[in-house]
């Protein structure tokens, strides 16, 4: 355990302009400043090279008491793990949020992504859908966990998952989903419903459907995750599972303080989420009571 206290916590996040980060950082800062900590924030843009620069800098300066970090491309092999090990060996507690690197045994505060993926597909199944597709993010851990839940929901209902109906896209693809439109609709052609990785995907997908004259929910039902402002801005308001956002930030900060005060504290925490029903899902048959 480190003896010297700098009253300084570093926060590393992927995107400054995502709809999730501002409320998360608000939650983090509120809790930390009450305890007398300053927060320094850096952004990776979900790029591993940028993450390397930031970690290097933190190790050189050596003036932090703890690190709260959203990993870059958490589903892919990461060349920066030794920097985290180095910080850990110096007695600096590290807490991940939203996702984690599977190779590092470090705690994480996040949404229960697997459970949410399962609940999302179960909601479509309950409303009579059986040909269900998914659009998931390939380079972030949340995408894999949401897919894992999606699979278990489908298999639990005795429905075979058609791999052709599951589309994987990465961070770079997300920047220009329009260019994937033909491909997306080809893959989802036989589906009556789709689980979207998040509201960003669902929002863009609903816009693409509009352009092609595909009616949501009559021709395609959409369930999304995050319940951000985008869910209500879409042409058809999206049924979505809320991300804990500010509550997640507060929890991460509380757990970080506990980890600084007690090196044996378990900083892991998963947030449950319950669906917010709007207009993007069609009932194909009456749900079983």
Could you tell me what each predicted segment is?
Residues 4-122, 183-186:
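Alpha-helical recognition/docking segments in bacterial nutrient-uptake
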Residues 178-289:
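Flexible loop/turn connectors
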Residues 131, 161-165, 216-221:
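Short acidic capping loops at alpha-helix termini that bridge into adjacent secondary structure
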Residues 64-65, 129-131, 192:
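Short acidic/polar active-site loop segments enriched in Thr and Asp
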Residues 13-23, 41-50, 72-75, 99, ...:
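Hinge/beta->alpha junction and helix N-cap segments in small-molecule ligand-binding domains
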Residues 3, 123-132:
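Glycine-rich phosphate/diphosphate-binding loops that line cofactor/substrate pockets in enzymes
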Residues 32-35, 90, 155-161, 188-189, ...:
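Short helix-capping segments at alpha-helix termini
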């Amino acid at each position: 355990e480190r003896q010297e206290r700098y009253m300084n916590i570093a926060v590393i996040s992927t995107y400054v302009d995502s709809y999730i980060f501002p409320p998360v950082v608000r939650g983090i800062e509120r809790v930390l400043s009450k305890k007398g900590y300053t927060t320094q924030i850096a952004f990776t843009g979900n790029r591993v090279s940028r993450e390397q620069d930031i970690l290097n800098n933190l190790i050189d300066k050596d003036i932090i008491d703890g690190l709260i970090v959203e990993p870059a491309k958490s589903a892919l092999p990461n060349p920066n793990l030794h920097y985290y090990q180095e910080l850990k060996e110096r007695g600096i507690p590290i807490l991940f949020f939203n996702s984690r690197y599977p190779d590092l045994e470090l705690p994480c505060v996040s949404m229960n992504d697997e459970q949410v993926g399962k609940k999302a597909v179960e909601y479509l199944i309950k409303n009579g859908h059986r040909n269900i597709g998914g659009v998931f993010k390939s380079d972030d851990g949340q995408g894999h966990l949401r897919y894992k839940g999606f699979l278990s929901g489908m298999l639990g209902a005795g429905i075979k998952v058609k791999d052709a109906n599951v589309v994987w896209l990465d961070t770079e693809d997300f920047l220009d989903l329009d260019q994937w439109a033909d491909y997306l609709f080809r893959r989802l052609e036989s589906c009556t419903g789709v689980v979207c990785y998040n509201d960003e995907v669902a929002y863009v997908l609903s816009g693409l459907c509009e352009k092609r004259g595909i009616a949501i929910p009559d021709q395609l039902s959409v369930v999304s995750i995050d319940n951000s402002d985008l869910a209500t801005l879409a042409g058809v308001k999206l049924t979505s599972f809320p991300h804990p956002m500010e509550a997640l930030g507060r929890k991460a900060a509380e757990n970080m303080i506990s980890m600084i005060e007690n090196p044996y504290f378990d900083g892991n925490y998963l947030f449950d989420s319950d669906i917010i029903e709007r207009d993007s899902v069609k009932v194909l048959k009456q749900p079983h009571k």
